[in-house]
C-alpha cells in the first residue's frame, strides 16, 4: 500500500530547490563550469535555446559561450517553486553584452533580462531543463 507522506515530499522539494540555487550560483555567477558534473546527469537535455543542448559537454560549451558574450553576468533567483522532482525558478539576469551572441551583435551595453527555468531531477541531479528567456532586450 502506497501512503502519502507530505513530510517526505516537502523535504525532497526543499532539497531540489537548494540544488537549483547552488546550480545557478556556482555555474553562472561563480563561473565554475567544471562543477556542472555535480549538478547535471551526463545525458542532460536543455530545451528552449536556439539549439538544444544535449549532454554535459554541450552544456559546458553553451555556458562558456554565454559567459564569453556576457562576462559580468549575474543571475538572481526571484521565485522558486517545487513539486515532487521538479523545480521552477524565475530569475533576473544583469550583464553587459560584450560579444556577438546568437544573431545579436555585441552592443557593449548593460541590460537586464528575465526568464523561467523548469528543472527535472533524477536522483539528486538535473536530467532535463526547459528555459524561456526574454532575448528581446538584446535587440534594443
State each model region's role:
Residues 2-140:
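C-terminal and inter-domain tail/linker signature
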